[in-house]
Amino acid sequence: MSISRRNLLAAGSGLALTGALTACGSNTGRGDGGSGGATGGSGGTGGGDLAQWYHQYGEPGTEQAVRRYAAAYKKTKVTVQWRPGNYDQQTAAALLTDGGPDVFEVNGPTLDQIRGGQVVDLTDLFAGVKDDFNPAVLAPKTYEGKIYSIPQVVDMQLLFYRKSMLKKVNLQPPRTLDELVNAAKELTEAGDRKTKGLFLGNDGGAGSLGGTPLYAAGLSLITEDGKVGFDDPSAARALGKLRQLYADKSLLLGAPTDWSDPSAFIQGLTAMQWSGLWALPAVQKALGDDFGVLPFPKEGGSGKPSVPVGAYGAAVSARSKQQAAAKEYIKWLWIEQEEFQTDFALSYGFHIPARVSLAQKASKLKDGAAADAVRFATDNGYAQPLLWTPAGQSAYQDALSRIIKDGANPDTELKTVVRKTNEELQRVKKKSS
């Protein structure tokens, strides 16, 4: 089982992005590439060559690309390892030994890895370029003002809609959550039992949306000063409207493929679908111009449109005996080599370069829905906070599922989640004191 970028996002949305960024397999467009053994040499941290680890991607050509990038670096020989299996567990274990990588790709680093001194501070590498990185994806890689990994590319989720289906019932693309609820109901009623109004996933949306509705209500999972960000009546109102979608029977459930695959949307089983940027090329190929994309609509007077974003990053092991050389290499690759960064983002899948300037220049992202997506990621993107722990994620995910599918009281459910999240934040603070 290899982690995927799609999973990274599920985690960023509030789904146990750590357990599922959140899936195994191919949910992000860069998923499971098979189950062979690790290739490309052993761990590093000794002298001479630098050892670099990547999780095993499923997109054809990616492995060859990263080996080509490494070979182009002339100051030091870089040996790439392509790691199948549970990559997060492998790197967590390797960071505790002298046989791990010098440089490694990471969905993080985690708070424990940062506070445990297992990764190297990379803040100095961002001099003069920090403002060119999407701040939403840089934030979870930052702790107490220091940056611990360089974002490689950005992935995101967004709402797809069929222009012709909305036009048929005289609807505009929904800009508020109320409009989304109403549009989904009208589209379902007009669908002659063949087409549902909205597809959020076969579980009704708890797994795919996560914290997105909270951000759309102007809230957050964790505030910038480290407090619970959704202890507010508007949180319950927002989640109650997800229940309304389910109760109205406006949601497609039991589709042959889940939310991360655009097949249900392409086949006309749903007029609107929550999915990811990775799905855009397939949708465009099948539907031409008969679709558009939107962020999750805002909720309430203090709300704002919202999209979850996430990014794998490049980090340096604190066990490396070549930290200076490792830092110099990843600065060269992920900050200086703009051509490689754009190639990695767009030649083997469909992703956004982590540098805002590169995203704006990329020809594949300049027009239509792709350009809209880049704008949403820049203007409306949020990422899973570093302090949003697995225990808090799990409590929220379970509560959201009960609210949507069982009609549980949102206020009651969220009070329990707020209490659990507060306990987690206190635990984290005690550990750091």
Give each language-model segment a name.
Residues 82-90, 178-179, 254-263:
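Short helix-initiation/N-cap motifs at beta->coil->alpha
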Residues 148-152, 157, 178-228, 270:
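Extracytoplasmic/periplasmic solute-binding protein
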